[in-house]
């Protein structure tokens, strides 16, 4: 930290106080956003923090002027938070910011217009990020992380403020998305349901009136929830909406959407192009796609094992594991095509021994009972049309469309 004289510290603090009060007086939301964006680590805020750590009695400056003292509670907590943030005391920074945020929300509630909505977004974002950092600090010191959960409670309070009628309600979706990020981080995604119900069933909300950015984020998170619920058609609809409306320059965001949309599409029998996987660095799906195309169960299992940690973290491992049935279907189709070339008259009759032999070639050693069980499941799931002749150990395939395409429908439960 560069040396700051007492006089310079006084000047910097007074300048911030004037800029804050001007922003409120002239309803200048963009300036207010910059004044509250701690995580941006902007030079003006860092220099203010240095000044606050030199001039310790900033509260006296606030009290000296009626103009400043009108927002005294807000400003005092902002200063305390920024001081602590600058010296790396993230827990104290969070606690002070939480008090500031509550005071700011109360002030926002009293303002008739929605001029400060963007500034409120900054407050919601900053408290979530600061809570995550504070919890990381607490965990590293062997203490219980609890700040993000508390931040979630504040965000719910903000949602309640915005969920009424009037121009402020357009901000409800942004706060909802911050709540989603909080709940996903905490592993309490079940708490998302009440907020979703408010957005999707309340008559005061028209989804199309929300900003595009927020709609994309909302569809991304609700799409992920549908993946966890294994409601793949709904997940496809929501994630596809997010992809189609995402800013094409935001490649990182597109990749985040595709991390979930690709396994959803695969579950619906839709295989992405190799070019898509290359363009967005989704190499973890390359071998899975190859396994589906080839009917290679060994390759699928190898790909799942190779990227197991990544798939588990994303929550798509079980979704991808269930693709085994589609791989079996592709393998049966290959056996059928080969038999059709060598013995057209009996192409629709697949011997279980022949299937077992093909599986052994893929290092999948199964006895006939296991093969029969797999074929029974494929028939039950409508991935194969036909029936099992148990005594003769033969699968008799339908002569009409023996391997139905999913055509965007999930494998039946």
From Swiss-Prot:
One of its GO terms (cellular component) is nucleus. It holds the Pfam family PCI. GO terms for biological process: ethylene-activated signaling pathway; poly(A)+ mRNA export from nucleus; response to ethylene; root development. Disruption phenotype: No visible phenotype, when grown in absence of ethylene. Extreme ethylene responsivness, when treated with saturating ethylene concentrations. Curly leaf. It is found in: Nucleus. GO terms for molecular function: double-stranded DNA binding; RNA binding. Expressed at low levels in roots, leaves, stems and shoots. Detected in seedlings, roots, leaves and anthers. Coiled coil: none annotated. Residues 216-402 form the PCI domain. Its main location: nucleus. InterPro entries: Csn12-like, PCI_dom, WH-like_DNA-bd_sf. Keywords: Nucleus. Involved in the regulation of ethylene response. Probable TREX-2 component required for nuclear RNA export. The TREX-2 complex (transcription and export complex 2) functions in docking export-competent ribonucleoprotein particles (mRNPs) to the nuclear entrance of the nuclear pore complex (nuclear basket). TREX-2 participates in mRNA export and accurate chromatin positioning in the nucleus by tethering genes to the nuclear periphery. Interacts with EIN2 (via C-terminus). May also interact weakly with CSN8. Interacts with DSS1(V), AMPD, SAC3A, SAC3B and At5g61290 (AC Q9FLK4). Interacts with UCH1 and UCH2. Interacts with NUP1, anchoring the TREX-2 complex on the nuclear pore complex. This is Enhanced ethylene response protein 5. It comes from Arabidopsis thaliana (Mouse-ear cress). The gene is EER5.
């Amino acid at each position: 930290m560069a040396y700051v004289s007492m006089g310079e510290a006084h000047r910097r603090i007074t300048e911030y106080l004037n800029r804050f009060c001007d922003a409120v007086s002239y309803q200048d939301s963009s300036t207010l956003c910059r004044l509250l964006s701690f995580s941006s680590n902007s030079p003006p805020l860092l220099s203010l923090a240095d000044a606050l750590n030199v001039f310790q009695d900033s509260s006296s400056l606030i009290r000296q002027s009626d103009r400043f003292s009108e927002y005294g509670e807000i400003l005092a907590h902002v200063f305390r938070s920024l001081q602590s943030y600058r010296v790396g005391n993230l827990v104290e920074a969070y606690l002070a910011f939480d008090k500031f945020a509550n005071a700011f929300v109360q002030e926002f509630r009293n303002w008739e217009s929605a001029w400060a909505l963007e500034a409120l977004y900054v407050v919601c974002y900053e408290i979530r990020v600061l809570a995550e950092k504070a919890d990381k600090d607490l965990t590293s010191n062997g203490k219980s992380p609890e700040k993000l959960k508390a931040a979630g409670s504040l965000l719910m309070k903000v949602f309640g403020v915005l969920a009424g009628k009037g121009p402020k309600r357009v901000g409800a979706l942004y706060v909802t998305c911050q709540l989603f990020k909080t709940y996903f981080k905490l592993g309490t995604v079940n708490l998302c349901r009440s907020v979703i119900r408010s957005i999707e069933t309340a008559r005061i909300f028209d989804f199309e009136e929300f900003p595009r950015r927020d709609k994309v984020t909302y569809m991304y998170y609700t799409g992920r929830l549908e993946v966890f619920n294994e409601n793949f058609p709904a997940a496809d609809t929501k994630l596809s909406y997010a992809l189609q409306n995402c800013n094409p320059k935001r490649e990182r965001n597109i990749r985040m959407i595709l991390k979930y949309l690709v396994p959803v599409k695969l579950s619906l029998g839709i295989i992405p192009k190799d070019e898509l996987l290359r363009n967005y660095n989704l190499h973890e799906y390359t071998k899975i796609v190859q396994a589906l195309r080839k009917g290679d169960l060994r390759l699928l299992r190898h790909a799942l094992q190779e990227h197991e940690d990544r798939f588990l973290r994303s929550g798509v491992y079980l979704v991808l594991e269930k693709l085994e049935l589609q791989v079996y279907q592709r393998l049966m189709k290959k056996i059928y095509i080969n038999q059709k070339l060598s013995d057209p008259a009996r192409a629709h009759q697949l011997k279980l021994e022949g299937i077992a032999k093909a599986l052994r070639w893929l290092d999948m050693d199964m006895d006939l009972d296991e093969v029969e069980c797999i074929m029974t499941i494929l028939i039950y799931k409508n991935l194969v049309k036909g029936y099992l002749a148990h005594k003769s150990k033969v699968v008799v395939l339908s002569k009409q469309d023996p391997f139905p395409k999913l055509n965007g429908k999930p494998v039946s439960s």
